[in-house]
Amino acid sequence: MLINEVLDSKSIALSATENASNQMPYLGLQWFPERKKQGLDLSWIKTHKGLPVSLAPSNFDTIPTLRAREGLSKEKTQMAFFREGMTVGEEEMLEIERIQSADDPYLASALSSVYDDTNNLVSGAEVVPERMRMSLLATNAGHPVIAIVSDGVQYAYDYDKDGSYAKDHYAKLTGTSMWSDTANSKPLTDLNNARKKLQKQGKIARYVLMNSNTFQYLLDNAQIRNSILAQNLTATIEVDDDTVVSVVQKRTKLTIVLYDKMYIDDDGKEQYFYPDDKVTLLPDGNLGSTWFGTTPEERTARQLPNVDVTTYGVGITVATKTEYGPPMKMSTFASEVVLPSYENMDSTFVYEVHSEE
């Protein structure tokens, strides 16, 4: 049995879909739903007030970067192209070729390791847009930016070129105001101040996004504990997660959203998609869209008889290329052209609640 009789781009995409159904969903999709354009030029990606995103060599320090797998051309579309690939090993190929029938019980075993590798490819492609979305929501010192490394140069997609977002929609807490000072800080006051500031601009915040490490500040906070005690006649009370979520919602009209999903960065280290020591006030409804463009595989591979192409989800391209040899070889690629728009960024507010001063 030839490998391309049992393994193709459609089966890889199906396996990845089944694998994804068992994982924590990507929260960013709630505010940046996926959409697709044929092509995709940077001029189509909009920020607040209909302004386009700008791309330039980055002058932002200590910002997590995404590594483009192909050259990023500032003169052309200015869009980063991400591609990862793998080759099915000769040993696996021979094992599958020995199998005579699709009903053979050894077929599933032979394919399992292949699907594990291809699932990792597709999962890696899904990580890219979520990192982008969370970079915008967390900001870098108040600036919504996405950093890309291409050909040894770091570029930044800057969604706040005039600095107006950082001026009006971001605050860095200092001194005893930092939430890490659990005895003196006033997180309920901070959240209400930001919510009311948005409300004066006609924007209604419904949620406050953070991870569990930041949430711990609230569990230990004196203002919150006093607020809980004021609602109870007993001298002592256990402060648990649900109680804190409830009092924050009651006092600020904001629902806490905890997001602890992690990814492995290019250095092999685990990172939170939404970082420590930040909180973002968010509205109901969309903030923008996650735009996917046309990949080179989509444009050209369909014309090649030895290349099989399927779209996974909205915009990730899964392609398999078979070389009949000898020896026979199959290569699998997952690729994407992707960037979020952020038209409703003025509906958000970001606090940096702790920093090393």
Which residues does each predicted region cover?
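N-terminal alpha-helical "arm" segments
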Residues: M1-S43, S341-E357
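Hydrophobic alpha-helical segments and helix pairs
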Residues: E5-Q23, Q154-K186
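Short, Φ-rich (hydrophobic/aromatic) sequence segments
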Residues: A16-T17, D190-R195, P340
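Assembly/oligomerization interface modules of large self-assembling protein complexes
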Residues: W31-I99
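Intrinsic-disorder/low-complexity loop/linker signature
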Residues: G50, G142, D151-G152, G163, ...
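Long, contiguous amphipathic alpha-helices that act as assembly "spine/axial" helices in icosahedral shell
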Residues: A80-Y165, P187-N213, M328-S335
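Acidic/histidine-enriched, beta-strand-rich ligand/metal-binding domains
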Residues: S177-N213, L219-N221, R225-L229, A235-V239
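Sequence/fold signature of self-assembling virion shell proteins
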Residues: N221, R225-E357
